[in-house]
Amino acid sequence: MIRIFPSVFASALLTVTSLPLSRASNSAELGFELSRQLCSRCHVIGEYNRMGGIGNSPSFTWMVKSSDWRERFLTFYSRRPHPVFTRVPGYALWSDAPPYYPPFEITLDEIDLIVAYVETLRNSQ
């Protein structure tokens, strides 16, 4: 799978954090758990937090309606505002500016799990 990452990202330090996941039996369940832990502070990710999120952050159910939803989710870490606080091993930081949210680390495999969860939202529409 090809992942696009803008060349604007220079070099910097990665912050390593651990992400405990509950016991889930499949990719979509793991993706939901990751979404709940990492994304729900800004986005409505489904019925879990339908009254949550930040007002100007699009909900997962809204974003999945876009024809390029999969690419957007797979490359979210390179799309503003995510690069300031999202760390992906093997990719340089976007800026030396301090993050305005606590930074977190996510792997490309974990992003694939989130996409598996989001696909269930798309299929349920």
What positions do the PLM features span?
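Bacterial N-terminal signal peptides that target proteins for export
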Residues: 1-9
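The canonical Cys-X-X-Cys-His
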Residues: 35-46, 114
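Gly/Gly-Pro-rich "capping" loops immediately C-terminal to redox-active cysteine motifs
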Residues: 47-78
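C-terminal capping alpha-helices of c-type cytochrome domains
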Residues: 91-125
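Positions in alpha-helical segments
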Residues: 29, 58, 99-101
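Hydrophobic helical h-region of N-terminal Sec-dependent signal peptides
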Residues: 9-15
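Electrostatic cytochrome c docking/interface patches
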Residues: 15-34
